Amino acid sequence: KEVSRNEKEGRKIMDTGYSKWRKLDNAALAFPLVTGKNDTRVFRFYCQLKEEVNGEILQAALDQTMEKYPLFQAVLRKGLFWFYLEHRDIRAVVKPETEPPCSRLYIPDKKSLLFQVSYDKNRINFEVFHALTDGTGAMHFLQELVQDYLILAHPQADLPQIEHAEEITHGDKEEDSFSQYYSSDIPKDKEKKKAAVKLKGEKLVHSDMHVTEVALSVKDI
């Protein structure tokens, strides 16, 4: 019997006959417990185009991108001992941007996808609940989405399809890098770095978040 790579590496994927599920990796375990109305644990990546976004073409591009990222087609469920991601046949739908940035995506007991693609004028937004993926995964997804969009929007341009340097399996995409690379051994002589600059002032509640856009001449900077 031929054994797949996922089986060889002991990936925690179970086919129940109705759905597929997988445990959250170690770095994501805390997010479902601390998320709420004022702390959504959602982050945003966006791409600013030189042209206005066509919503219908963006939807077609998202459908294509989702075929390459089946692990994103999942809802967050709570089991007896842990949270887990369960595959669901829910179509990801593109929406015009109407909600405040990084609005709540995970609501307990609500079976909805953990990311949202929206657009406003020339901008394509990708917002995702942090338990689903990290910044690297989000960046790759958005890159793929924008590439698919531009190819569909400009078929006459014959734009190249940029492939990954090497094949990435579903197992690679769901690898628990925290367990693989984290070490509690911290060198005693580790060089101390300067603290990051912290913004001062009164912090707004999440519902008051908004996008501020400013256009100015480079010569004035």
Regions found by a protein language model. Give the residues of each.
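Flexible, P/S/T/G-rich "lid" or insertion loops adjacent to the active sites of thioester-utilizing
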Residues: 177-221
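Short, Lys/Arg-enriched N-terminal segments with co-localized hydrophobic residues
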Residues: 1-13
